[in-house]
Amino acid sequence: METGLRTGELIGLTWDSVNFEKRTITINKTLEYRHKQGCWRAGPPKTPSSYRTIPLTNRAYEILQSVYATKDTRKQSPALNQVLEFMDRRTGEKSSLIMKDLVFINWRTGEPAKNSSYDTHLYKLCDEATIKRFCMHALRHTYATRAIEKGMQPKVLQKLLGHNSLQTTMDRYVHVTDDSLRKGVQQFERNNQDQNGVKLVSGQ
C-alpha cells in the first residue's frame, strides 16, 4: 500500500537497494519460491520499465528504519547462505542476489517469506474483518486507484508501478470506485452551480 511493488519485488528487496539518505528504494531484482522444485529463484524485474527508483512515503521509511535497526538480531536459516544468480534484463549480464542481505524475512523461521505466505496472512486478516478475501496483487491495484483519486498524475503512477504503457496502468490497475463516482458528481454539481446559466452543447 505504501510502494505499489509487485510481491516478487518486495520479497527480493535487499539493503543495498535502500537509500536512507535519499529516502528511496531501487527495484532491480525479484525473488520467488518455486514450490514444485522446492527452491528459491532470483530473477530480473518483469520488464525493462520495471527497473526503477521509488521515493519512500514517511510510513515506508519508518518501517524500513525499524527493520534495519533489528536486522542483526533476527534468526537466520541456512537458506540465507545462498547467492542466487540471474540475468540482467537490460544488459544481458549476470547479476546476483545475496540472500543474507534481504530486507524482509520470516522472523519465526529465519527464511524469506514465500509468495503464498503473504496471501495466506492476508486471507486470515480478511476473515477476521469479515470481508471478501483478496491477494497481495490486489493491494497493487488499490495503490494505483487511490493514487489517482488523490490527484497523482497518470504518467507518474505509470513510472512508480513500472509499467511499459500508460494504458496498462489506467485500464488494468486504476478502478472507478463508488466513492470516486460520488465525488465526481459532487464536483460536477459544484461547477454547475458556479455558472449563471446552462449552455446546451450539441453533438454537432
Which residues fall in each region the model found?
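Catalytic-site neighborhood detector that most strongly recognizes the C-terminal catalytic loop/helix
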Residues: L31, T142, L161-Q187
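Ser/Thr-centric signal marking residues that sit
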Residues: T3, T7, T47, T142-T145, ...
